[in-house]
């Protein structure tokens, strides 16, 4: 239940964070996430935001990286979403990326008790379409056979 609370809190935080100023992603576990800049979040109890969350990612990413090459992208985007200077809001992965991650990791997510959480998370992410194409991103290694990309 703790992770459900944190994901909900994080979604609210991201909604109010601006990417007017980005900072480098310093969490080593996120080095394969497909981006290097994240939004500048406020400190948590006087500690840098990324320092607070790096330990959680250090646990979850190794658990899931063996089942999907998109594990880092999905998990890191929850805590340190992609940022681009001058862009109003952080970027999040498109729904197809999350759905592919869940499909590839369904067994591991089920055993960890996280399948429902990530299935719901994927449903909340934007589809790529003319209205939302600039609200989500695909990692460079994403190949979607249904779209040819």
PLM feature spans:
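A positional/structural detector of protein chain ends, strongest at the extreme C-terminus
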Residues: 1-3, 148-149
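Mature extracellular/luminal domains of secreted and GPI-anchored eukaryotic proteins, especially small
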Residues: 18-149
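Cleavable N-terminal signal peptides of Sec/SRP-targeted secreted and luminal proteins
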Residues: 3-19
């Amino acid at each position: 239940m703790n992770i459900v609370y944190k994901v909900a809190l994080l979604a609210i935080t991201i909604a109010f964070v601006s990417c007017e100023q980005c900072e480098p992603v310093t969490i080593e576990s996120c080095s394969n996430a497909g981006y290097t800049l994240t939004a500048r979040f406020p400190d948590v109890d006087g500690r840098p935001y990324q320092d607070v969350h790096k330990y959680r990612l250090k646990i979850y990413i190794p658990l899931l990286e063996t089942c999907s090459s998109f594990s880092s992208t999905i998990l890191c985007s929850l805590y340190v979403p992609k940022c681009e200077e001058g862009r109003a809001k952080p970027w999040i992965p498109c729904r197809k990326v999350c759905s592919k991650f869940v499909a590839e990791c369904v067994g591991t997510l089920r055993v960890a008790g996280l399948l429902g959480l990530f299935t719901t998370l994927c449903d909340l992410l934007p589809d790529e379409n003319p209205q939302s194409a600039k609200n989500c991103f695909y990692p460079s290694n994403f190949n979607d056979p249904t779209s040819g990309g």
